[in-house]
Amino acid sequence: MKSYKKILPLFSIALLVILLYFSDLPSVVDVLLKTNMFLISIALVILVASVFIRIVRWKLFLKNLNIDSTWGECSYSYMPALFLSNFTPARVGEPIRSYFLKKMKGVSMSKTIPSVIVERAMDVISLVILGVFILFTFNLGYIVYVDVFLIILVIIIGIALLRNERVAGRIFGVFFRIFSFHPRLKDAKRRREEITERFHSGFRIKKSILSVVFILSLLIWVSEGIIFYLAFLSIGVELSLFLITSIFAFSILMGVITFLPGGIGSTEFVFALILSSYIPLSQATAGIILGRFLTFWIIMFIASFFWRKV
């Protein structure tokens, strides 16, 4: 397992090195030096709005659970989890925000984890909606269609199973048996029915809130698509917003499928591969570097400050 964790970051670095090599690094640097900083500043404003929408979405989930949380509590439970989860494959570390919330308010993790699961499902569905259009532009092979279909199928089946209290109880039963050696889980095993009920209640989301959350999820990813559009525009590349957003969403999905931490390497590689059909690879890579810096690395930088204070 440890060797597996070491290989993934190395694979990410290797993909980035290969991309930069074939993009002609001096040409990429030359393109980046001509960046229009005014457009980048507009992108930063949109980025701040995108982060705020993420926190609003989390607050809505907590409101659905009748958890009275301040904006500070929402931020300090969400942002550190975002920072840590980006180091995990497919951001599977997201549920740690439930731990941070428990640490601050004493709220049971089993009560809030379902909201995190639904939120991640909304993200993936939003990305599929935005990214599916690019599939019809290129003959990307049947395996891509199969992967996207399997992602949606797993999400639907997974949520359907977890919403079933009996199934959830059995899953917890297996979990507690496997990890019964842990002293804290021994106590939790005795409260399995109580934990299962809390977990199951977390999936009872009002339709009105679920609809708003879905719209917010779409808005988050569209705003990040706009940031990429501005990044390309800032280096003199004029492509349609629709095209950039669709390729961006599809690339993020492919990054999730590869299970590389934060999708680093795989997202950029797929993005550049598709975009090189429209513009020179050096311009594609330069725009992607700018876009990823704005939508990923700056968010990581901001989130790290919240992490230090938790």
Describe each region flagged by the PLM.
Residues 42-46, 212-219, 251:
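Alpha-helical transmembrane segments of MFS and MFS-like solute carriers/permeases
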Residues 54-61, 80, 97, 224-231, ...:
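Hydrophobic/aromatic residues in alpha-helical transmembrane segments
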Residues 73-80, 242-253, 283-293:
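Alpha-helical transmembrane segments of multi-pass membrane proteins
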Residues 189-234:
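Alpha-helical transmembrane segments and their immediate interhelical loop/hinge regions
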Residues 28-36, 67-71, 104-105, 199-206, ...:
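Helix-boundary and loop/linker segments of multi-pass membrane transporters
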Residues 1-33, 81-185, 260-310:
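Transmembrane helix-loop-helix hairpins in multi-pass inner-membrane proteins
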Residues 32-42, 142-151, 204-211:
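Juxtamembrane helix-entry segments on the extracytoplasmic side of multipass membrane proteins
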Residues 55-78, 231-247:
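Membrane-embedded helical hairpins/re-entrant loop segments and their flanking transmembrane helices
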